[in-house]
């Protein structure tokens, strides 16, 4: 979908939320539940983070991933409560261990139903007593807990900061930039408004700002640029695509931990470079590169196709050396720093 969707921004945000609420099929062991979670994230990808967070806290796949099914009154499991605050909504240092214990009580009773791909609240397993969370006291349950957490000023800064980190730069935004982004996020917690605000920031297009593309984003962009739809490939080629992503260390629905995938230089290892080269060769082998082949300046033509404004002298020299073979040229261009690292 990332390679073929008419609205790639929505698919990119769906991918972002998959990494943010990182859930692995390895433990969930239900493709149906993983697909249902993916649909939920797509539905809310560009909407209100409130709606997304409310849906995710009782998402069946996430419940199984973070031991929600074993969270019951009298014997709470703290895993979901802790990760929801630390990794999904607040960040480290903005809650206490007491908050985790009390939040776990608020989330008791929710169980994933594999047969219906839904979650339901089992009243006899829910702790309906008074809880003390983040300085507030009340009979908190799942949805009221979410609203309480998202109402903290730290939450807006955290969520906006994560969007910036994954979409713009590993360097945090300046204080004035962060304030503008938080203002755009607003009380509605509007993801689309934040994205508009991000793209309006000078830093978004500053050549000094760079971000190493995640393998899945790199491959999806390459498939889209070269006009290759994964669904049109034969089984062997699709298997090779998946093997290539595995070699790069990023397979959808199989994040290494609840913290999601690595970022930045972690994707620039020697082994990753070899895997990227093989993937680029595979995609180029199925691409229609007629326009590049006919161009007098093939390096510029492939740059236009990939959305690269300019090649460095070093990359130009490398491209010149393979200009006689348009598929080899495309492979080298796809693995060049100017494409692997967006700036």
How would you name each of these model-derived features?
Residues 152, 156-192, 196-343:
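Flexible, low-complexity segments enriched for small/polar residues
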Residues 4, 22, 68-71, 147, ...:
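A ubiquitous short alpha-helical element
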Residues 30-231, 235:
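Active-site substrate-binding loop specific to GH73 endo-beta-N-acetylglucosaminidase modules
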Residues 1-44:
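N-terminal accessory alpha/beta regions
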Residues 10, 14, 55-59, 197, ...:
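Solvent-exposed, amphipathic alpha-helical "stalk/arm" or coiled-coil-like segments used as scaffolds
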